[in-house]
Amino acid sequence: MPKIIDHDQRRRDIVEVAKSIILKGGFEAATMRSIAAEAGFANGALKHYFPGKESIVAATFETVLHEHDTWLQESISEGATPERMLQQVLQGTLPSGVAEIASGRVLLALWEYAMSNDALTVLYRTHLGRWHAMLVERMEAARDAGSIRDQDYAALANEFISVAVGATVINLMYPDGERIADYENYIDQFLARLR
């Protein structure tokens, strides 16, 4: 009986290997040869799943953005008050653990590549747009519940996104989460300013 191969799982495994190599050695370390060796493939066998490094990088970029979206959705408790949901969204967008920090570090390593790839630029801008809309929506819901004051929520969402991106950059130098308490304090201060 022929062996059944889950090709989608193999692609996911290859992306995980690429992420691991990028974390250890940066973008340049993730060559087709290094990815194949780490994944246990012959160099040419990767081409069955990805035609080249560009397609692996694109899949890795998409995977990291999907991870961030998933963590954000999972941070929200059903039935929470609008203010608590806002707090959860804020907490879900700032790095809160080693896995989120590692994922952010991979994303940053891929930014330079994404700048010259129109499809990835659009993908990231779309991600930022969803994130911004979610923050504004959560602030408006908290306002409607009487928990926070009416303010320029679009500007506040932009500020928060900038801080979250900055936290991701800072984590390049603090990969073990030494700054997580600072981010939690910032969320408390941000919420206090909204009240």
Feature-to-residue mapping (PLM):
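Solvent-exposed, amphipathic alpha-helical segments
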Residues: 13, 17-25, 71-75, 106, ...
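Short coil/turn segments at alpha/beta junctions that flank glycine-rich nucleotide-binding fingerprints
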Residues: 24-28, 79, 100, 145
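Amphipathic alpha-helical segments used for helix-helix packing
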Residues: 98-122
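Helix-turn-helix
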Residues: 13, 17-59
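Hydrophobic alpha-helical connector segments
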Residues: 59-62, 70-103, 154-160, 184
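Amphipathic, non-transmembrane alpha-helical scaffold segments
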Residues: 11, 15, 61, 65, ...
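N-terminal intrinsically disordered/low-complexity leader segments
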Residues: 1-9
